Amino acid sequence: MEFEYQSTIVHQGVLFYVADGGDRAYFVHGGCIVSVHRRSREIGKFGLTLRGNAPGNRVVANYVRTELARLGRAWAAPQGSDDVFVDALGLLLPLTELDLCGRAELDVYDPYLVECMVSLPASALSLTLVHDRQQDRVLELLAEPAIVHPSSGFVYAVNEACFALVQAYLSELPSSLQVLTEGLFDGIPGVRPPLSGETRPTAVVVKGGRAAPTLSVRPRRYAERALRATVVSDFVQVRYIPATRRIWATRGGSLSLQMLCDLVAGADAILRRAAGASDDASAAVVEAVSAVAADPFFGTGSTSLTGAQRFALYQFILARWHLPSCYAALEGMLDRLDERPGAGAGDDDDGGEGGGGGGHGGSRAASAVAHAVNRVLREATVFGEVMRMLVNAAVVHAPAIADPAGASPPTTKHAREDAATGLELAVMMSDAETNALDADACELVEAAGARVLDGLYAGRGLVAATAPVGRALRPTSAVCAEAALLTAFGDSPAALRGAQYLFQLFRARLTRANISIVLNKNR
């Protein structure tokens, strides 16, 4: 949902967003948006409500009600409704309703709630629920929260059954919040009301698949009083239907070496055409290539391919293991080129390893492409295995993985960011408990992982790239030897793990560029 505003004002220490010519004001409360009007008595509340851990149940909402009651805050859960707004999560912490004013993010530490929200165990979650797009003067209420780990920044997939977007009608604000609106509109210039006395409804732009349902929340002091069956609202939800940008799917098209060669040969032409096109799918591809391939990444130093060509390799690997990719979208763009380039890839000068899958043809171009995609998969696999080993070593004795002063050059920013992403997945894939590493140990693991990534991104080879951590992890040579046998055209558990690490780092780079992966379920 999007809410336009014209200006902002700070009143009673809370930031209000002024709309409708000064007649309406919004404020953020624990990730929800609350609306008050100068003349109308309606109070609108928009936000996510808590549901269950699977479609059709309300176990999460009921659990939060129980916890609020245990803390002596049963009054915070609405009466006569199955829905509990997400701002109630803030009241599970030592916060008051006033403390939640202005908060667009919430932290969750309850292990049961954490696992219900992301279907994985974790020590804590940070939920972002509202974005203030100041340049557009728009408050954006997210259809599902953006969930990350507060310390590592790892981005989680959201359990859709846990949340639902709802518009609520409140006959009054909670008593603790009523002080916020006293005298609010005295300091806001208003427009003259129409002579007819009628006011136009406020448009709320809905970008989701359907309108948010409405409900009425009865006053706390009238908990047993029946609600009106029908509510006439000051708001009208306006559906916004954009041109599709859903280029992501978990299924690729033709995952043959020949098609990959064609894509690599045409990648730069695809990108040039997409940059000049007006459709949203082309714009999404251009943004994704820029976000992922602008900085060094897997295959940067070990292949002579361009950023667009390496991007095609990443999509092949993700599609090959049924992870979200835009490989099928790239195939469609290749077919629409006016003149389809002949298959031909840049030569790979690394020369130390054979390319699996060479049975598809004896051409030099095909061999170079196979070699390049294998190198990307092998680098991602080695990074993942080394990170898992670092986590296990840090649990036993974290100082052992510290880099001796001056032994290695400073790591780059993109390597540190990618290593932080890899750490979270490594913890889940290792034998360590989720909370076994303290902050200092996590920092040591991330630093060691960044040193490995800088070596891989620079094309130093698997053995040389892992040398900085060899003192603490003596079996790295065995890991490198095993990875050197992997091929992107075969099947093995190690290759799958490498593809998963590639995807996590790939998705994190998109997230840092404010790009979301929304699957096209028609593919």
From Swiss-Prot:
Q: Where is the composition biased (Gly residues)?
A: 353-362
Pfam families tied to this protein:
Herpes_UL21
Q: Which domain of life is it from?
A: Viruses
Asked whether the UniProt record includes Lipid metabolism among its keywords, one would answer no
Q: Where is this region: Disordered?
A: 340-364
Chief subcellular location equals: virion
What keywords does the record list, in alphabetical order?
Host cytoplasm, Host nucleus, Virion, Virion tegument
Identify the GO cellular component terms for this protein: host cell cytoplasm; host cell nucleus; viral tegument
Q: Where is the signal peptide?
A: none
List locations, semicolon-separated: Virion tegument; Host cytoplasm; Host nucleus
UniProt function note? May participate in DNA packaging/capsid maturation events. Promotes efficient incorporation of tegument proteins UL46, UL49, and US3 into virions. May also play a role in capsid transport to the trans-Golgi network (TGN).
Q: How does it assemble?
A: Interacts (via C-terminus) with UL16.
Family affiliation: Belongs to the alphaherpesvirinae UL21 protein family.
Q: What is this protein called?
A: Tegument protein UL21
Taxonomic source organism = Suid herpesvirus 1 (strain NIA-3)
Which gene name belongs to this protein? UL21
